[in-house]
Each structure stands twice: as structure tokens, then as C-alpha cells.
Regions:
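N-terminal hydrophobic/helix-forming segments and targeting peptides
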Residues: 1-432
């Protein structure tokens, strides 16, 4: 099971590739890809289908034995994006006549220092000319070799570096791409790389490239480590590990009375306020359309919402042995201790006593341990998907996730055992 997760992480350096890989696995398992611009048609028990939005979010559905008005929805949601650096337009910056850097901007909230002095690569999507102005073609790109590096300043020029350094997002974190050896290469290095990669798939001319969404990614493969290989080291565990756990559960679960939903949103790391984010009404539209297809009435959707339950799956903070003072004294999850239910008195999480009891019961039924997380009262925490989604669809639900160390680092640390626990709990949820 863990090797499949590692393969998925290695093949999914950015949101676009993660969604494509999820879509491919859904298709291989018999789910039909539907165009959301077309009618759903008649739906019957066992029908399995999915739709995508913006190439970076994906929504999978399996219709249950009972109409949604009678049995509701069981929904697992997660997000496809992770903190990184986005490559700006006109990105090449020439220094001293030959050294080429790329101009980037920060996406989300990365621990920027963790991106230094490690091999990086480029991944994302390229938009090329299509049949007409409103129908450009999307091509995905993943340069599968080390291509760039952000280098530290030597300690001899910065004697205070180990006392903490404030980094400039515009100056200090620009990656080195290469050296130009020919006058014709100046201003063309990045585009030449893009063309080389795209032409592995099909012939693309430079004039056909209209734009791109390209990002930096760690070029070092995900791996396990520890005396018993009990830990996972990888970028993007937050939140691709939860995406993959939800996918594994969806593909292995039995058909049940309840309609099963897997929703992988984008842009959680920047607030979710996009057409492909959790704040979008897109999922609500799809659920309402399922109700209309079954009954011809919106009333089915409103009844289903009252019977539904949502698991918002986004990683939690594991207790760090070097910084115990940062954690709540009685509610600090441990690596390998099982899925973590998140609570916050300021309502940053959807969990309450009633919904937490439901999830804890699911874990118990699946034979999985369960933990609880509350922030240290003097340390501000983050927010996640649950309440954002619940503000547009008033779902009963819980915010949870597997515990990880170094959240938002270029490489995070998780637990092999926790991934196995999470898949069991999610599968139990879908089976009920």
C-alpha cells in the first residue's frame, strides 16, 4: 500500500498532475469521465463517474442503492495544491552576462529555507493554440530530472546565518537555471525546455504556446526511512497523502445505500476562493444535479444535505520531540497514532462533539486508533476545508488528517502506519 502512495507522490509534483493521475485511476477502475457542461442523464445504483474543473480539481461519485433524498451523501474532501513557487511570465533573468535565474512568486505559505540547496525541477501545465480562441489545448509538463537549485549565500559572507535570516521573496529565493553559452540562448532557455518536453508527446511550435502555469518542485523522490522504515519523507504530503487515501477508499469500497463522493479541491493553500476551490458552488451544483436526475426536484438535494456527512481530510501537526513547548499539553498527536480529529474554539475547524463522535465510531468499527488535536492556546493555528465548504453546503462533518512533521516544508515527514489506518477508516465510512 505504501509503495503506491510513494509512486503517486513522485508522479504528482503539482496539482495538475495529481488530478490527472487521480482521474486516470478512476477511469481504469470503471468510472466514466463526464463533461459538466452536458446533462447527467438517468442515474441508477452503481453508476460511477467523475468530473474535473480547471484541470486541478476532481470530483468522483458512486450512486448508492437508495435515492439521495433517503440516504444522503458520504463525502470525503481534500486538496490538490501545496506551497511552492510559481514561475512568473518573462521569467528569465540574466546576471553577469551568462547566469540565468528564474523570476518566481511564492504560492501559499512554504517554509522557504527548506527549498535551498536541493535539486529542483519544473512541472505544471502549458496552454497551446486550439481549435478557436475559447478552446485552447492544455498539455501537462513534468521535467523528470534535476533542473534548478536555489543556493544559499556562503557562511563567510553571512556569519549570522545560523542565528536566523529574513528572506526576501523577490531576491533570495530565485532559482539558478543554467549558463548561456550562445547568444541565441539568451531569453530562450526556459522556452527551449518547455518545447523539448512537449515535443516528447507531440509536435508543438513555439508560436503555438500561449501561456503556462508552471511551478517549482522537489526533484528528489519520496521515500521511507527509520529503523523499521516507519516514516515517509516527501514533499506534498499535505495534502496529497489525504487525496490518495480518499482515492484508495473510493476504489476499494463496496456499493452502499449512500451515494459516495470524493471531492479534491484546489487552492486551499491560498484561501479556496476560486472556481476550483472549496468556496466555489461547483460541488453543490453537482450534488443538486444528481438529485434532479433522480427525482426531477431540488427538494431531493436539500433532504440529502440533512442526511449527509463530510470528512474534510487535511493533514494535522504531529508532536515534534525537539519543540514540545509548541503543543497543547494534553492534545498533541503522535506519528503512527492514527487519524487526528481537529478542534478549535474559534470554529476554524468543522469538528464538534457530535461529528467527532461519528468519526471516532467509524475508526473504532474499522479497528483504527484515533487522536485529537487542539492548538496550544498561545499559538495560532491554521484553517482548512471543512468550514469553507460548510458555508456553502451546510454539511455535518469533521476536520481530520494524518499527523505530519514539518508541514509546508519542501519535504514533510509522515507515518506509514497512519496512511494504512486512514485508508481503513475512509473505506469503512464509504461502506456504511
Amino acid at each position: 500500500m505504501i509503495n503506491q502512495l510513494l509512486d503517486f507522490l513522485n508522479a504528482s509534483p503539482v496539482n495538475f498532475l495529481a488530478v490527472r493521475n487521480i482521474a486516470d485511476k478512476l477511469s481504469d477502475s470503471g468510472f466514466r469521465r463526464l463533461d459538466p457542461a452536458m446533462p447527467l442523464g438517468t442515474l441508477k445504483a452503481g453508476d460511477s463517474f467523475f468530473v474535473t474543473k480547471n484541470d486541478s480539481s476532481v470530483y468522483a461519485f458512486r450512486i448508492g442503492h437508495k435515492p439521495i433524498a433517503d440516504a444522503g451523501f458520504h463525502i470525503i474532501c481534500a486538496h490538490s495544491d501545496s506551497p511552492t513557487f510559481r514561475i512568473k511570465p518573462n521569467a528569465e533573468m540574466l546576471a553577469e552576462g551568462s547566469m540565468v535565474k528564474l523570476n518566481t512568486e511564492v504560492y501559499g505559505g512554504p517554509i522557504m529555507s527548506t527549498w535551498f540547496d536541493r535539486p529542483l525541477t519544473i512541472a505544471g501545465r502549458v496552454i497551446v493554440r486550439g481549435a478557436d480562441a475559447f478552446s485552447p489545448e492544455t498539455m501537462l509538463l513534468h521535467v523528470q530530472r534535476p533542473l534548478l537549485q536555489i543556493s544559499n549565500l556562503a557562511i563567510h559572507f553571512n556569519r549570522q546565518v545560523n542565528d536566523g535570516v529574513k528572506l526576501s521573496r523577490q531576491k533570495d529565493v530565485l532559482p539558478l537555471l543554467g549558463q548561456v553559452t550562445d547568444e541565441l540562448e539568451k531569453g530562450n532557455l526556459l522556452m527551449n525546455i518547455i518545447l523539448e518536453e512537449l515535443n516528447k508527446e507531440r509536435e508543438v511550435k513555439r508560436d503555438d504556446i500561449l501561456d503556462f502555469d508552471l511551478y517549482l518542485a522537489d526533484a528528489t523522490p519520496a521515500c521511507t526511512f527509520g529503523v523499521h522504515n516507519e516514516f515517509i519523507s516527501s514533499g506534498r504530503l499535505d495534502d496529497l497523502s489525504m487525496c490518495y487515501a480518499g482515492l484508495e477508499a473510493m476504489l476499494s469500497a463496496d456499493l452502499s445505500d449512500t451515494t459516495q463522493v470524493l471531492a479534491i479541491f484546489d487552492n486551499e493553500e491560498t484561501g479556496s476562493q476560486t472556481k476550483q476551490g472549496a468556496a466555489s458552488p461547483f460541488l453543490a451544483f453537482m450534488l443538486k444535479r444528481i438529485g434532479m436526475a433522480q427525482s426531477g426536484s431540488e427538494e431531493a438535494f436539500y433532504q440529502a444535505v440533512e442526511r449527509a456527512f463530510m470528512i474534510s481530510a487535511d493533514n494535522a501537526h504531529a508532536w515534534h520531540p525537539n519543540y514540545p513547548e509548541k503543543y497543547d499539553p494534553t492534545n498533541h498527536p503522535m506519528l503512527g497514532g492514527g487519524p487526528v480529529i481537529k478542534f478549535n474554539a474559534a470554529q476554524k475547524y468543522a469538528s464538534d462533539a457530535a461529528s467527532a463522535a461519528v468519526f471516532a465510531s467509524l475508526c473504532e468499527k474499522a479497528g483504527v486508533p484515533c487522536q485529537r488535536f487542539v492548538n496550544h492556546s498561545d499559538v495560532a493555528g491554521g484553517s482548512t476545508l471543512g468550514n469553507i465548504l460548510a458555508s456553502s453546503i451546510p454539511l455535518r462533518g469533521v476536520d481530520m488528517g494524518n499527523a505530519i512533521l514539518a508541514m509546508h516544508s519542501c519535504r514533510e515527514t509522515g507515518s506509514v502506519r497512519d496512511h494504512e489506518y486512514c485508508v481503513k477508516a475512509f473505506t469503512e465510512f464509504f461502506n456504511l
